[in-house]
């Protein structure tokens, strides 16, 4: 089990580019594989989660060439996938498993999805139940709640579904099934979740309507291959945003970051805390808004975080907790129960780790209260096998009173394979 020790930094300075967006990378493989003709993808994130998706489609007969810079996907059309001869291994990727469940449910073959020990603990009924209402035949442990999932492909019918949680994975699974279903598939949510699927469906020519009331997909229309440029992942950029804010004497430019408004909760939260973040050269690339982000060290203050901003920053909460740990006053997080069913229980994991380095934290059922500390203490903490927990605590170490060691850091490769080189590049010692 690999551990990593980070020393306090004297500044976070320079200019970086973070790897491609994980969510968009997943979807580019999926839609490119079931489109007609060739799809090219530049900026694809070669993290373990996305490679799991890529390998799944290769196992279903899709030819995907990778020269290290550009992926070329020879699309099979809606009905061109082949039955896999073995279990499709999703690794640690909840996105791969949940979206593939929606895509595989209407295929005319049998398939099985599994993953690592962490993924096999995560809840899957949230996609199995609505897909079953569409006519899908899906079997899993604990009544469809846990993987492995065995899927017997069937013809599906569109439904109107109101999700109890704002989850892009649930929504996207139903949208993918809806491409094949008879009639309309309509999905509404309590708050708008990230809309990468809607944007990419439109880019590939799907019959789709979306707005504040939800999304409607009409089945049967073939998709056409497209050229895609994947922007930098704001969830990866978030670690370096927080680093530059909390380490005195910092100024960092992060180039080419996706700033989709359904993902910019992290910017809104850090700005509300008093952070200096400036969006430069705003433009649109492959249907997604992109900008360069200039971050300067700032004195942060505690705030209350709840409501519609929560799903727009759901993946960034571990590192938001680090910002809160060094902010003046108390930060209160509520309506974030979804954090308990991520790769690990992120509320419990961050509470445990922050307490281990001297921060006062009180858990609630759907969030936490964090009392800002004058300085984070040195110590040893756990990743809990969760890439975002590991990276967040390494960022905490940049402003601690001594070294922080994080155990089991191999998991960082699932989403951010270049994290360590970038950290060493910008951290002044």
From Swiss-Prot:
Keywords: Amino-acid biosynthesis, Aromatic amino acid biosynthesis, Cytoplasm, Transferase. It catalyses: 3-phosphoshikimate + phosphoenolpyruvate = 5-O-(1-carboxyvinyl)-3-phosphoshikimate + phosphate. Its EC number is 2.5.1.19. CDD domains: EPSP_synthase. Pathway: Metabolic intermediate biosynthesis; chorismate biosynthesis; chorismate from D-erythrose 4-phosphate and phosphoenolpyruvate: step 6/7. It is found in: Cytoplasm. PANTHER family: AROM/DEHYDROQUINATE SYNTHASE, PENTAFUNCTIONAL AROM POLYPEPTIDE. It comes from the Bacteria. Catalyzes the transfer of the enolpyruvyl moiety of phosphoenolpyruvate (PEP) to the 5-hydroxyl of shikimate-3-phosphate (S3P) to produce enolpyruvyl shikimate-3-phosphate and inorganic phosphate. Pfam families: EPSP_synthase (PF00275). 3-phosphoshikimate binds at residues 22-23, 27, 167, 169, 315, 342. The active site is at 315 (proton acceptor). Monomer. This is 3-phosphoshikimate 1-carboxyvinyltransferase. GO terms for biological process: amino acid biosynthetic process; aromatic amino acid family biosynthetic process; chorismate biosynthetic process. GO terms for cellular component: cytoplasm. InterPro entries: Enolpyruvate_Tfrase_dom, Enolpyruvate_Tfrase_sf, EPSP_synthase, EPSP_synthase_CS, RNA3'P_cycl/enolpyr_Trfase_a/b. Belongs to the EPSP synthase family. NCBIfam families: aroA. GO terms for molecular function: 3-phosphoshikimate 1-carboxyvinyltransferase activity.
